[in-house]
Regions:
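Short, low-complexity patches enriched in S/T/P/G
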Residues: 1-6
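Hydrophobic membrane-insertion alpha-helices, especially the h-region
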Residues: 8-21
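Hydrophobic single-pass membrane-insertion segments
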Residues: 21-32
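N-terminal Sec/ER secretory leader and immediately downstream segment
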Residues: 32-163, 167-175, 181, 199, ...
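Charged, low-complexity interaction regions
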Residues: 86-92, 112, 188-194, 241-242, ...
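Membrane-interacting alpha-helical segments
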Residues: 118-139, 219-237, 295
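Extended amphipathic alpha-helical interaction segments
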Residues: 144-291
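Hydrophilic extracytoplasmic domains
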Residues: 285-333
Length: 333
């Protein structure tokens, strides 16, 4: 069962990679780098928090520790979102009344007054950005995504001012911009691995200068190592495609040595064998299904019966799951 889960995980990752490829390779002309200007000192540690996934505020946290100096920082929006989960919005007047009372209960009067005024503006911003976004349309390419990111931040600057908007959202925007630009490079089918790595390093230097090398920490956990291994394969996709099958396999083994222990490599090779066996099983099934469907001497009812028997024989206890997958695929078409 555990090995089947691993196989499913690998297939899901491959599917996500294909979707990412189709999406990002449609980008058109470039958008200038650094939506958040370099003069706005955004901590590289703050950006890394967003790259790893910035968690929502929990009820057990004391929000005062994030605003001991300034009320405007990357935790401000997080704090406002937390308030909205704790204080229901029946109507704006009652909501603001409750929010004001809460802020004055946890912050000193001056900070509470400033934070409440900022929250009122934040509510108006949320309404305004929803209306603005309707005119921008849904991003369809990587270039569209960058333009959308730029447009959203420009709107925030109009509402809050440049300094405040960049302080509140700057780290998040830089993390998103870097991720989009890196993916454009990563899935470019015309580039070899070494060129992709060079361009990504150039991107880091362009966005972070002397701190470029520290923007992405070496993987520590097994999921992080596996993600880095998958990324390495994506970077060297063209190289791998141009190699004969045996050399391609050897290259993949080299990549694995960079991230996994000997025991982990053995388990991955076992999974490789099982994935190959699953693919062969499905290939054999479809060949037999085709023979049944193209047999002019069998009625449609008999064909359906024969195919169901074939599925039961080929996939055993997994036959029902296979049929459900076929139904989903047929409904999508």
């Amino acid at each position: 069962m555990k090995k089947k889960k691993i196989i499913i995980t690998i297939l899901v990752i491959l599917a996500v990679g294909i979707i990412g490829y189709l999406f990002y390779t449609k980008h058109s002309k470039q958008v200038p780098v650094n939506i958040i200007r370099s003069s706005q000192k955004i901590s590289i540690q703050d950006v890394k928090m967003f790259l790893k996934g910035f968690p929502s505020e929990s009820a057990s946290e004391d929000p005062r520790k994030y605003f001991s100096k300034d009320i405007v920082n990357l935790y401000t929006v997080r704090f406002f979102k937390f308030i909205q989960t704790q204080i229901e919005f029946t109507n704006k007047e009652e909501h603001l009344k409750a929010v004001k009372a809460y802020m004055y209960s946890i912050l000193d009067p001056q900070k509470a007054a400033e934070m409440f005024a900022l929250y009122e503006k934040f509510l108006d911003y949320e309404t305004g950005i929803r209306e603005q976004a309707k005119s921008w349309g849904q991003p369809k390419t990587a270039d569209d995504l960058l333009r959308y990111l730029q447009s959203v931040q420009d709107y925030r600057r109009e509402i809050f001012g440049i300094e405040v908007a960049d302080a509140m959202w700057g780290a998040e925007v830089k993390a998103k911009e870097y991720t989009i630009r890196k993916n454009i490079i990563k899935v470019d089918p015309n580039l070899y691995g070494t060129e992709k790595e060079k361009r990504i390093n150039d991107l880091k230097e362009n966005m972070w200068g002397a701190d470029a090398a520290s923007i992405e920490d070496p993987p520590q956990s097994d999921p992080e190592k596996y993600a880095s291994y998958q990324e390495k394969q994506a970077l060297y996709q063209r190289d791998l495609q141009e190699l004969p099958a045996d050399q391609r396999l050897e290259k993949i083994k080299e990549f694995r040595k960079d991230y996994f222990s000997s025991d982990q490599i053995v388990r991955l090779e076992q999974v490789d064998e099982e994935v190959a066996a699953e693919k062969k099983k499905e290939g054999d099934y479809y060949a037999q299904e085709k023979a049944i469907m193209s047999n002019p001497g069998i009625t449609d009812d008999k064909k359906a019966e024969a195919i169901r028997d074939l599925q039961d024989s080929a996939f055993g206890e997994e036959a029902d799951a296979f049929r459900r997958r076929l139904n989903i695929q047929n409904n999508i078409k």
